[in-house]
Every structure is written in structure tokens, then in C-alpha cells.
């Protein structure tokens, strides 16, 4: 049963695109969604992080099993609005595309889930189980909205979790984790004409970086068997087959020294230097392994001078490749999107890291949502109108089928 017209569905997306949630103000989307859901007798609750940032939780149905569905309300900065063909915070419908910041990442997926809930509720189609909507704040930064919901127990009883990030018609059963590591070297300043009176922090940090580079090389020589298989995703995006060595890069552990800063002026011995690393973790090389690795290299190079700080750490999430959510998606979605659904692991991260951790409870898990992932964070971001609309029907059928398993 269709409750909302195509025009209504586009209008609802336009309404939340209009709300400027560039890393803030998600509470305005919460209030909008709460009012919308109440019109269809769906109760919801706003869970605040602070006065401007909040999550929304809503439910339909009752009892077990519980299927959590989730999307984030924040968007990345739109940059210079003059660079956009159309205003970034006004939905523009042109040539079968819906333009606007967040249409793909990921207000399109979020609203598709909300509308699917509304239509299932109005048609009384849900005969068993509970659908729990978790609309989150702060996914684009530190996932603190998702972490708050996890800490307050909103995931404790779930059997399945769908994240509606844009996936280009790929169903992801797992994804890598992500860590940010900051290594600081502290030396002793001195005049450059008398460097022996100082301790060069840059030299110390260079030694650390070089040793860590060798450690990473050694790891990659043995990083050949992966629980997470990201090859199908990469081959679809690259439109070509990839070889065995390349597959080890995409499916395995990745570590990058992306920032190096040291010294302030040319005639002084630098007393401080910092190196920042982004690490993509996998089940075989998780956050505990990474922490131990950094501490080991620090001890070897010079623990009197070096420290490491880890400002963010999000676990890899894995589930069975053929879990019931994935099975339902691959069976149902082709009827609406008119192509077979590729199943893969994702090389990025989602709120599931905070929701599930390493998924020790073996929750059925899928990342699957409307939009082309390549459009995320871009100027002139858009989602195809037919894709947005079709995923509403996909979600309705997948939610219902999963709960009736």
C-alpha cells in the first residue's frame, strides 16, 4: 500500500535538505521527523547530545525480533555555495536527479527509511517484530550520536541492523574500522649554530616513521587471508578485475602517515614534531594490535621522547556474508533496481562501529542505501530520483521479510 505520493516523497526529502546540518543542528531534523511521524501515530523520542545536536528514536510494531534501521542527519560542509550549479540547501529536481547537500549522504537514505516505516504502519503490514529507527547526529565526525544510543541500550535487543548509507546497489555485510593516531616527539630547542646543545625532535620522529614503515611492510607480507572481502566492491567501482596483490591492499590492513609537522623556524633546533596516521583496521589486525604496535615502536625508537595519542578509534564490523538481511536484499532489491546486487565488504566505516563494536553478538548486519557513493561530499551532490523512490519499496519489503523470517 502506498500512502504518500511521489510528489510527497520528494517534498519530504526537500524539507530536510533545507535544514542546514553541516556538522551541527541535527535537532532541527529530529523535531521535523518527530512531527512527521506523529501525523501517522508513530511515537518517537529525541535523545539529546547537547542543545543543538541530538538523535531520534522511533518504533513501529512490537516484540521480537527487533530490526534497527539507521541513517545520520549531519552533512559535510557545502563549501563555497557559488561553486554549486544549484543552491546546496534547496532541493532541485532536474533531469531525473535530485540535487542538494545530503541528498546522497545521506538524507535520501534516511528519508526513504522513514517513509517505508510510515507506509508499513499505515497499511498494517507488519505482523511480527519491531522496526526501530535510529537517526543519528555526528556520524561525519566522531560518531558520538551512535555511541550515545549504544551506551543507553538502544542496540541491546536488536537482531538485525541496516545502515542506509549510499552503496551504489552494493550490499555490504561488513566494513573496516578506522583509527587516528598522533605521534608526538619532544626534544630540546637550541640555536642552529650549536645543535649539539639541543635534541632534534624531527630526527627522532623521522626514525619513528621509518621504523613504522618497515613494520607495515612486514605486516603486508603476511596479510594475505582476509575475513573481509572488499574485492567485489572495488571491481564494480573500477569496472575491471583486480589481481591478487591488489586485492590484499583493498581487503587488508592499511596504514598511512598522512601528516608530518616539525620545527617553526630555520635557525632553531626543533623541539617538537608530530606525525598523524590514519589506520584502516580489519579483524585480523584490530585496534588492540595497532595500539600495541605503536607502543612497541615507541619503546624501540625512544620512549623518553615519543608519545602516541589516539583521538578516534572505530572498530571493524563483520557479520556472516549470507546473513538473513543480505539474503533478503539480494532477493528483493533486483525487482526494483533492475540489476543484481553485488555483496561485498566496505573499505570505509559507518555508525555500526559504535552501535555494534566488533559484533560479538553476531547481529545480522547490512549497509544498503540509495545513492552513488562517489557523489558523497561533492559539489553538486545528487541522488537519482528513481533510485530514491525505488529504495522506499525495497526497504518496505526487506524490513517485512526479515521480521517474518
From Swiss-Prot:
Identify the EC number(s).
3.5.1.18
Cofactor binding summary note: Binds 2 Zn(2+) or Co(2+) ions per subunit.
Per UniProt, what is one GO molecular function of this protein? metal ion binding
Pathway(s) this gene product operates in, as recorded in its UniProt entry:
Amino-acid biosynthesis; L-lysine biosynthesis via DAP pathway; LL-2,6-diaminopimelate from (S)-tetrahydrodipicolinate (succinylase route): step 3/3
Query: Could you provide one GO biological process annotation from this protein's UniProt record?
Result: diaminopimelate biosynthetic process
Q: What's the protein called, per UniProt?
A: Probable succinyl-diaminopimelate desuccinylase
Family under the similarity heading: Belongs to the peptidase M20A family.
Q: Where are the transmembrane segments?
A: none
Active site residues of this protein: 74, 139
What PANTHER family does the record point to? Answer: ACETYLORNITHINE DEACETYLASE (PTHR43808), PEPTIDASE M20 DIMERISATION DOMAIN-CONTAINING PROTEIN (PTHR43808:SF8)
Alphabetical keyword list: Amino-acid biosynthesis, Cobalt, Diaminopimelate biosynthesis, Hydrolase, Lysine biosynthesis, Metal-binding, Zinc
Is Protease set as a keyword in this record? no
**Entry binding sites for Zn(2+) 1:** 72, 105, 165
Asked if the record carries the keyword Membrane, the reply is: no
What's the catalysed reaction?
A: N-succinyl-(2S,6S)-2,6-diaminopimelate + H2O = (2S,6S)-2,6-diaminopimelate + succinate
Q: Which residues form the signal peptide?
A: none
Out of the domains of life, which is the source? Bacteria
Residue numbers binding Zn(2+) 2: 105, 140, 377
Required cofactor(s): Zn(2+); Co(2+)
Amino acid at each position: 500500500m502506498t500512502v504518500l505520493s511521489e510528489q510527497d516523497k520528494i517534498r519530504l526529502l526537500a524539507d530536510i535538505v533545507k535544514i542546514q546540518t553541516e556538522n551541527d543542528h541535527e535537532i532541527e531534523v529530529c523535531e521535523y521527523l518527530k512531527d512527521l511521524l506523529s501525523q501517522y501515530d508513530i511515537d518517537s523520542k529525541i535523545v539529546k547530545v547537547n542543545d543543538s545536536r541530538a538523535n531520534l528514536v522511533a518504533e513501529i510494531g512490537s516484540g521480537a525480533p527487533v530490526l534497527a534501521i539507521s541513517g545520520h542527519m549531519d552533512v559535510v560542509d557545502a563549501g563555497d555555495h557559488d561553486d554549486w550549479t544549484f543552491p546546496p540547501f534547496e532541493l532541485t529536481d532536474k533531469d531525473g536527479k535530485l540535487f542538494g547537500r545530503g541528498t546522497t549522504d545521506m538524507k535520501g537514505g534516511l528519508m526513504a527509511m522513514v517513509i517505508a516505516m510510515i507506509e508499513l504502519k499505515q497499511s498494517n503490514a507488519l505482523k511480527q517484530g519491531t522496526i526501530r529507527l535510529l537517526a543519528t547526529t555526528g556520524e561525519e565526525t566522531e560518531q558520538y550520536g551512535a555511541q550515545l544510543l549504544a551506551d543507553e541500550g538502544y542496540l541491546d535487543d536488536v537482531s538485525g541492523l541496516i545502515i542506509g548509507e549510499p552503496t551504489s546497489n552494493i550490499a555490504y555485510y561488513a566494513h573496516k574500522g578506522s583509527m587516528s593516531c598522533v605521534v608526538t616527539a619532544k626534544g630540546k630547542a637550541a640555536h642552529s649554530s650549536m645543535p649539539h646543545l639541543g635534541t632534534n625532535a624531527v630526527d627522532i620522529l623521522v626514525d619513528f616513521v621509518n621504523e613504522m614503515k618497515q613494520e607495515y611492510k612486514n605486516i603486508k607480507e603476511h596479510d594475505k587471508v582476509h575475513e573481509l572481502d572488499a574485492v567485489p566492491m572495488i571491481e564494480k567501482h573500477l569496472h575491471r578485475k583486480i589481481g591478487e596483490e591488489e586485492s590484499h591492499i583493498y581487503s587488508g590492513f592499511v596504514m598511512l602517515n598522512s601528516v608530518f609537522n616539525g620545527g617553526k623556524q630555520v635557525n632553531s633546533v626543533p623541539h617538537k614534531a608530530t606525525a598523524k596516521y590514519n589506520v584502516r583496521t580489519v579483524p585480523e589486525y584490530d585496534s588492540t594490535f595497532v595500539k600495541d604496535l605503536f607502543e612497541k615502536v615507541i619503546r624501540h625508537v625512544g620512549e623518553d621522547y615519543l608519545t602516541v595519542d589516539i583521538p578516534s578509534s572505530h572498530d571493524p564490523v563483520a557479520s556472516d556474508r549470507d546473513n538473513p538481511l543480505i539474503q533478503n536484499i539480494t532477493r528483493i532489491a533486483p525487482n526494483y533496481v533492475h540489476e543484481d546486487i553485488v555483496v561485498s565488504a566496505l573499505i570505509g566505516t559507518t555508525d555500526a562501529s559504535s552501535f555494534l563494536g566488533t559484533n560479538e553478538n553476531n547481529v545480522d548486519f547490512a549497509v544498503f542505501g540509495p545513492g552513488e557513493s562517489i557523489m558523497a561530499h561533492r559539489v553538486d551532490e545528487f541522488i537519482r530520483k528513481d533510485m530514491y523512490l525505488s529504495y522506499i519499496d525495497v526497504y518496505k519489503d526487506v524490513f517485512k521479510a526479515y521480521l517474518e523470517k
